[in-house]
Amino acid sequence: MCNRQPKAVDLPPNYSCPHLLSFQSVEFNTNPTACDDVFCKRIESEKKYNDFLESLFKKYGRDTSDIADEVDLATGEIIVNNGHLEALKTKDDIWDPTFNNLEISASNGYEKKLDSSIGNPGEKAVSPVHIEDFQSPQIYKFKNLSLRDEMVSDCVFADEVPLASLFVENVCNETIPSQSCVRLKINDKTRKVDASALEKKSCLLPNSSGTLTDQRGLDTIKHKSIEQNEILHVISDTLSSPRRRNPLLSSPKTPLRRSFSKSKVRNSNSTKRRNFISLISMISPRPNLSTHHFNLGFQPLSQQTSFSGSSTQNPHSSSTCKKAFCFQCISESKKC
């Protein structure tokens, strides 16, 4: 901890101050603060650390230039060989004499990994097409096992077909297992659509050779574009309609739920109107709702006609009025 002594400050001879005219020097008594203590402790700890490192180097440090290995960084050759690098060397290192070139070693390692990924020599050879099929997405849930056996593992889609059509087959198999599906092949891209919807749109079926032919045996090369548009239209119709409105995709076990919020609002509005009508029925004569600024959009015509008919035949009188609260009776009593 450092202790600072008060210092005397000498003012210049031409210094003029109205409050210090009778003083030649000013003394400032400065006491050390917490910041000063922290600053002094940091200086002392840094000096102690430097002294400790210096003592370590003096005790254990030595010059290793005479025993170390020296390597030329440009060529990678060992200029001064004292055996240190040779002891650390392995057969897979870059400077191993069996591998003179880095590119040859890298290519050999890649070929080994490729051979191990394909399989043993005794196994069946795997073509690059099968490797792409293995990496392609697949559908794993099937209710109909025959469709699973017939399905091609390659699931490449055309740009015109939406991506959501991948799940059409899975949804049909889950909801309606007995629904028959027909597989169509468009430009080597497999699709399955509903048979009932297909009969309405087209009469084309696949043959054993994989090409589309007409039921009457006609050539369909001229109708290729028309056929593709029809099939895409069937798929888009199946996917565009929501699941709750499509009877083929909606499950019979789960009925449609009625919105609770809408029914609550409807009940509250009907309750307000019913209470308002019951309140109006206590008032006579009945007011015209169209004259008020809070017009509710309805008017009890039947009650107005009955009142108008009764008013012409039986005029109102306080003696014959049976209502508990009547404005007309009160107004007549005030006039009297």
UniProtKB/Swiss-Prot annotation:
Keywords in alphabetical order, please: Cytoplasm, Nucleus
Q: Which GO terms describe its cellular component?
A: chromosome, centromeric core domain; chromosome, centromeric region; cytosol; nucleus
Q: Enumerate the transmembrane spans.
A: none
Q: Which InterPro entries match?
A: Histone-fold (IPR009072), Scm3/HJURP (IPR018465)
Q: Region Disordered: what ranges? A: 243-269
Q: Where in the cell is it found?
A: Cytoplasm; Nucleus
Gene Ontology biological-process entries: CENP-A containing chromatin assembly
Which stretches does UniProt call biased (Basic residues)? 255-269
Q: What does this protein do?
A: Centromeric protein that plays a central role in the incorporation and maintenance of histone H3-like variant CENPA at centromeres.
Task: Report the protein name in the record.
Answer: CENP-A histone chaperone scm3
Species annotation: Schizosaccharomyces pombe (strain 972 / ATCC 24843) (Fission yeast)
Gene label: scm3
